């Protein structure tokens, strides 16, 4: 991600709505829900062999979809909490995804949902999977996320800051836990409860262990981040991979590099190297143009594993469906663009909306494909997506 300097009006709103923190929200997560475990904990399994990874890829076919949150939710908590869970909108919008030929979606979870109501949370996940399966969509679930607001809280979520990109998205875990490495063990129950419940479920295609774990969100939320965030995230991601592997899921585990140089093997940072070496299948993020995407894919091919781009598509940066998706289709790289239906996340606005004031919809949307009523932002773009997914085929 690229962030610009936060303007005073936004800083004030973040302070007002984001810093008020209910410490009770970070209680003990170790309790397991009764009667929901379908996978038992054992020794952590090894990283898949390349042969097993490619057998999995052969069974899934070319994966293509979006990062998904319903238009009625501002963040992961509003999507999944019982009072705001919206299966009707989810069903409608996943129907639009099916109409594009999408067969997967990347969907974010949150540790606080487990703490709040583990059994109810698992039930809503199961309901989501039932809806997705009806539309022939197998999601990739994201367990942790280090991007945007580091002060999540349960209950009602704040309203969007007008015209500001992702103004209410929250990190998982928040800064209160991430700052204290001694507290990490309380997250084990969440990881193993979720992966244990769904680790053999054919409706799930993969698990993304930690989204952009070394993202310091500078300068938007930098002042509210743990001082040693990157080091602490490195500790947590290593634990999280072990916790997930102890449940022996049948789906692959992965975590995506998103910054730095991984084209030159001698310049790969230890954090990035760990994510790549620990992933059953390789994922990465790129909002760059087609030339750089080609270089990144070529570099990642040295790992000899299936490759998925789990974030791309920022139209003003040259990362468009028409320019990027043909590369992925030709090279059999899975593809998840950022943004699906325009709504409370407001990701039609660019990253610089944290600094530059917008008062109306931008002429060129940054992310997203559909308006909240199902009308496409760009009919020609939607026709292109349908054409290439039909040509590439869905297995």
Regions found by a protein language model. Name each.
Residues 1-7:
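N-terminal secretory signal peptides that target proteins for export/translocation
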Residues 38-281, 285, 291-292, 303, ...:
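Active-site mouth of glycoside hydrolases
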Residues 11-28:
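Bacterial N-terminal signal peptides
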Residues 383, 387-395:
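Catalytic domains of carbohydrate-active enzymes that cleave complex glycans
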């Amino acid at each position: 991600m690229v962030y610009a300097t936060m303007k005073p009006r936004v800083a004030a709103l973040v302070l007002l709505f984001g810093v008020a923190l209910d410490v009770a929200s970070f209680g003990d997560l170790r309790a397991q829900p009764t009667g929901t475990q379908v996978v038992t904990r054992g020794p952590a399994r090894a990283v898949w062999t390349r042969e097993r990874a490619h057998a999995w890829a052969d069974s899934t076919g070319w994966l293509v979809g979006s990062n998904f949150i319903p238009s009625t939710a501002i963040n992961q908590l509003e999507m999944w909490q019982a009072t705001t869970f919206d299966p009707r909108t989810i069903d409608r919008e996943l129907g639009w995804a099916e109409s594009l030929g999408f067969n997967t979606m990347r969907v974010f979870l949150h540790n606080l949902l487990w703490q709040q109501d583990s059994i109810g949370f698992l039930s809503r996940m199961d309901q989501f999977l039932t809806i997705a399966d009806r539309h022939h969509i197998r999601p990739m679930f994201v367990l942790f996320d280090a991007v945007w607001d580091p002060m999540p809280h349960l209950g009602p979520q704040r309203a969007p800051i007008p015209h500001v990109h992702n103004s209410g998205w929250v990190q998982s875990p928040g800064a209160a836990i991430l700052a204290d490495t001694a507290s990490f063990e309380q997250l084990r129950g969440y990881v193993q409860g979720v992966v244990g419940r769904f680790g053999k479920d054919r409706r799930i295609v993969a698990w993304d262990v930690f989204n952009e774990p070394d993202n310091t969100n500078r300068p938007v939320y930098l002042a509210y981040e743990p001082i040693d965030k990157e080091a602490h995230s490195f500790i947590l991601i290593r634990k999280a991979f072990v916790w997930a592997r102890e449940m022996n899921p049948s789906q692959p585990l992965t975590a995506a590099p998103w910054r730095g140089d991984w084209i030159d093997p001698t310049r790969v940072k230890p954090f990035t190297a760990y994510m790549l070496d620990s992933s059953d299948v390789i994922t990465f993020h790129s909002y760059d143009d087609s030339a750089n995407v080609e270089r990144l894919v070529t570099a990642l091919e040295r790992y000899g594993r299936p490759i998925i781009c789990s974030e791309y598509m920022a139209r003003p940066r040259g990362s468009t469906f028409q320019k990027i998706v043909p590369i992925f289709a030709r090279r059999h790289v899975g593809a998840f663009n950022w943004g699906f239906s325009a709504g409370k996340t407001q990701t039609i606005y660019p990253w610089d909306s944290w600094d530059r004031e917008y008062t109306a919809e931008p002429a060129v949307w940054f992310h997203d494909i559909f308006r909240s009523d199902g009308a496409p932002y760009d009919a020609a773009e939607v026709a292109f997506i349908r054409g290439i997914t039909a040509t590439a085929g869905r297995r």
